[in-house]
Amino acid sequence: MVQSLQTFSVRDIASGGWFKQHEYIEKLNMQAILNASAGQEEMIKDLLVTHGKIPTLIHELISVEIWKLKVFHVLCQLQDFQPKSTFPLYMVIHHEATIINLLETIFFHKEVCESAEDLTLDLIDYCYRKLTLLASQSSDRRTLSQNRLLPHTANEASSLEELKQQAEALEFDIALKCLSVTRYISDHIDSLPLSVMNRLLNTHNLPCLLVELLHQSPWTQSEKGQLQKYESGRWYPVPAEDQLKMTKLDGQAWIALYNLLLRPECQQKYNINSFTKGQLLKLRSFLTEVLLDQLPNLVDLQRFLSHLSVSEPTPPKKELILEQVPEVWDSIINENSGKWKAIAKYQVKQAFSPSEEDLRSQAKRWAQTYNMDVMEALVPEKPKCGSCGSEASKRCSRCQSEWYCKRECQVKHWQKHKKACDMVSEAMKNMQEEIQKEA
C-alpha cells in the first residue's frame, strides 16, 4: 500500500487511480492515529520514511489545495453542472484534511521531518498560508466549523453551495492541524537545513503570526456567556473549573514560540526590528502565573521578553547563503496555467457524473473505509457531553454521533441537534440502502 503511493497531476484528481490512493491514505491515517494513541510501535511512520513517501504526501497535499482554489471554484460556477451526488466531490475536498491529519500524527518524529527533504519548505509555505487565513478570518469561523455537514448520497443530492460551506468548515480544522505541524518542525529545526530556519523566521516571520493567533485564540469563544473550546473537531462548553486550563492548541503555539525565540541558532538568525519587537512584547500580558504553572519552561521566555524590552536587538550578520526554494506550488500553477476551466469540464464528464452502478460501488467502498468501530477507536479521549461538556457515556440513538452525560442534557440540546441528527440519520439510511441494493 505505502510503496504504491504516487503523485497525480491536477487533471487526474478524482480519477479511479486517485480515489484508490485516497482510500489507501485514509486507512494509513486511521492506523497511524490508532498506533500513536495506543502507544504502539508506529509502523506507518516507519514505512512512509523507509519508502521515501513523505515528499509524495506533501506534493499531494498542495495539489489538492490548488485544485480547491482553481478547479473547484470553476465547478461551482458551471451552470449545467448538477451532480446526482456530491459525495465524490466531498471526498476530493476531504483529501486535503486527511493528508494534513496524517502528517500531524507522524511529524512529531525527527526522522519524518528530515525525510521531507526539499519539500519541507513547501510544507512550511502551506502551513503559513493556512495559518494566515485563520488569523484573518472573522468571528464567523465557529458557525463554519460547527455546522459541518455530511454529504448526501445518490438519493438526495446536496447543492454545490452547501458543499462550499463544507469546504470552508474543513479549512478551520486544516489550519489547526497546520499549527501542530509547524510546532513539530520547530522542534527539530536544529537538524534541518538553514533555509528552513530562515523561511520560518525571516521570510514568514512565524513568531509574529503565532503572537496574533494567541491574541485571537480562534479555538476559544464565548456564546451567551458560556466559554467554549474547540477540540477533536468540535466545540465544547468548558466547565467553570477548567476555564483557565491551557488548551492543546495554546500549548502548540507557545512551544513553537519557545523553540523559535530561545534556541541559540534561531536567535542568531532572527531579524528582530522595531515592529517585530513590539509584536513579541505583547506576549508578556499572557504570561500569567496560572499559565507558567502549566508550562514552566515559559519562564525562560518571560526572561527573554524582559531583556528584549530594555535592549535593542542586534541585526543578524549578513551571510551569503545558497538557499533552497519551494517548488511544488509554482510548478503545479505553471503547468496548468490557463487550463483550469478545461480541467473542470473534463472532470465533470469523467469523474463527477458517475452512473448509478458506480455510485453504489463507491458507497460500498466508502462504508468499508469509514467503519464506525474504527472511527470511534480513533478518539483517544472519552467523549464529552454535547450540552454541558462533561464526560459522556450515552449517545443519540438515531444518529449515533452526539454524546450526552444524562437525559436532561439530551432534551435541553435537542433543538440545536435536531437538524444535524436528521441529516446524519438520512445519510446513513441512504448509504445502507445503496449497499443493500449492490449486495
UniProtKB/Swiss-Prot annotation:
Principal subcellular localisation of the protein: cytoplasm
Transmembrane feature ranges: none
Compartments reported by the entry: Cytoplasm; Cytoplasm, Cytoskeleton, Cilium basal body; Cytoplasm, Cytoskeleton, Microtubule organizing center, Centrosome, Centriolar satellite; Apical cell membrane
Origin superkingdom: Eukaryota
Changes seen on gene knockout: Ciliopathy phenotypes. Although a large percentage of cells fail to generate cilia because of a substantial defect in ciliogenesis, the numbers of centrioles is apparently normal.
PROSITE patterns cross-referenced by the UniProt entry: ZF_MYND_1, ZF_MYND_2
Keyword Kinase: no
Zinc finger (MYND-type): 385-421
Record keywords, A-Z: Cell membrane, Cell projection, Cilium, Cytoplasm, Cytoskeleton, Membrane, Metal-binding, Zinc, Zinc-finger
Residues binding Zn(2+) 2: 396, 399, 417, 421
InterPro entries referenced in this protein's UniProt entry, alphabetically: UCP037948_Znf-MYND, ZMYND10, Znf_MYND
GO MF, one example: zinc ion binding
Protein name: Zinc finger MYND domain-containing protein 10
Organism the protein comes from: Xenopus laevis
